[in-house]
Amino acid sequence: MVGSGTDSRYLMYFFTASHPKIGEWLKADMAKHNFCFDPDYRAWDNPVGGSDQQSFHLKGVPIVWYHTGGQPNYNFPSDEAQTINYPKLTDITRASYLTTWHLANEAEY
């Protein structure tokens, strides 16, 4: 859940290593929009795991994955709305939109 996590600024930003522009876009958008998170950029050659990006990667589709490190109650009945960091969730949503915009408007993609 991108709005959760124990550190209010922490964000892992995974992207397909063979598409470095995807990492460059967030860096440029960070400078322009002053988002409330501090990304740890992680270019990935071979993403593994059970998250949603895996099936896209296996088909050769470049991936982006925002991960906030989770929180102890994630996917449990004790997981409640008060654990969501709404400003961070909002900024990650904005950054995701901008990444999608870049993908749609770059001739390479």
Question: Which residue stretches match the model-derived regions?
Answer:
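Active-site-adjacent substrate-binding region
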Residues: 4-109
